[in-house]
């Protein structure tokens, strides 16, 4: 890693949760970084991303937790993005090489996207390099052994909104639909899938690569077990003629 008068920030995707899914380049940069910035949602909790990285590096590291609260209030979020950007700039402008770690891929529904935009607006002289990571839905497909698309099939990736906006249209338009940010909306999603006779064409993978990982090939069975919406991805294969069981 080349040293500069002003350091550089690396935005690093660390994958879905399994430390072994960290890419070689990501691990190399993390091992060489002077300081690692870790996002967390709860003021008093720990950073999940940090707990993953702490198991992969033996070199002494300076860790800095950056809080990004779980809220949709843009005014509140912008204040935290600016605070995080200032904290990063404070260290990187000293010549330190920094790594901001994020689950999955940095450019897929990641806090890093907003942080990068804030850095560009307020600290344009700081060099930033983004390192891709394995996304949750890629890992979910691999764990469940489900091809995402083949031939001329089309795929959509959607976050689940409270009103399920756009889901019905996606199921009618695409061959494969990936549902992310399922969370507490799982019951509503299941009801829609049942209405469209898609429960047996859907697979849910939760806590991918983590202790307690679950792979459920028939969502109708979710009624008999604990609901698993948190940290989950649902893959719906509309084009499959056979059930995914």
Regions inferred by a protein language model and the residue ranges of each:
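Class I S-adenosyl-L-methionine
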Residues: 1-19, 24-26, 31-127, 190, ...
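Solvent-exposed alpha-helices and their adjacent loops that cap or buttress functional pockets
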Residues: 2-5, 28-29, 92, 100, ...
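A contiguous loop/helix-start segment that scaffolds small-molecule binding in enzyme catalytic cores
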Residues: 9, 171-245
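Short, acidic/turn-prone active-site loops that include or flank metal/cofactor-
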Residues: 16-17, 41-44, 68, 153-162, ...
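Short gly/pro/ser/thr-enriched loop/turn and capping motifs at secondary-structure boundaries
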Residues: 43-46, 71, 135-138, 186, ...
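Short, surface-exposed amphipathic charged segments that create phosphate/polyanion-binding patches used
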Residues: 76-85, 143-146, 170-173, 215-222
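Class I SAM-dependent methyltransferase SAM-binding "motif I" and its flanking Rossmann-like core
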Residues: 108-172, 224-225, 238-242
């Amino acid at each position: 890693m080349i040293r500069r008068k002003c350091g550089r920030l690396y935005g690093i995707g660390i994958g879905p949760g399994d430390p072994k899914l960290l890419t070689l380049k990501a691990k190399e940069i993390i091992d060489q970084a002077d300081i690692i910035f870790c996002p967390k949602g709860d003021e008093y909790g720990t950073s999940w991303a940090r707990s993953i990285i702490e198991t992969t590096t033996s070199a002494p590291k300076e860790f800095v937790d950056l809080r990004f609260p779980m809220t949709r209030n843009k005014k509140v979020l912008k204040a935290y993005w600016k605070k995080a950007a200032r904290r990063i700039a404070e260290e990187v402008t000293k010549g330190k090489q920094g790594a901001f770690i994020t689950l999955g891929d940095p450019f897929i529904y990641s806090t890093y996207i907003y942080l990068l935009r804030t850095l560009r607006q307020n600290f344009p002289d700081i060099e930033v390099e983004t390192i891709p990571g394995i996304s949750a839905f890629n890992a979910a497909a691999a764990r469940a052994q489900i091809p995402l698309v083949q031939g001329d099939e089309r795929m959509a990736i959607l976050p689940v909104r409270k009103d399920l906006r756009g889901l019905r249209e996606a199921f009618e338009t695409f061959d494969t639909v990936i549902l992310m940010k399922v969370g507490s909306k799982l019951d509503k999603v299941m009801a829609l899938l049942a209405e469209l006779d898609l429960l047996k064409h859907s697979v849910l993978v939760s806590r991918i690569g983590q202790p307690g990982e679950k792979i459920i090939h028939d969502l109708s069975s979710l009624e008999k077990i604990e609901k698993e919406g948190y940290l989950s991805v649902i893959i719906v294969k509309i084009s499959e003629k056979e059930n995914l069981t």
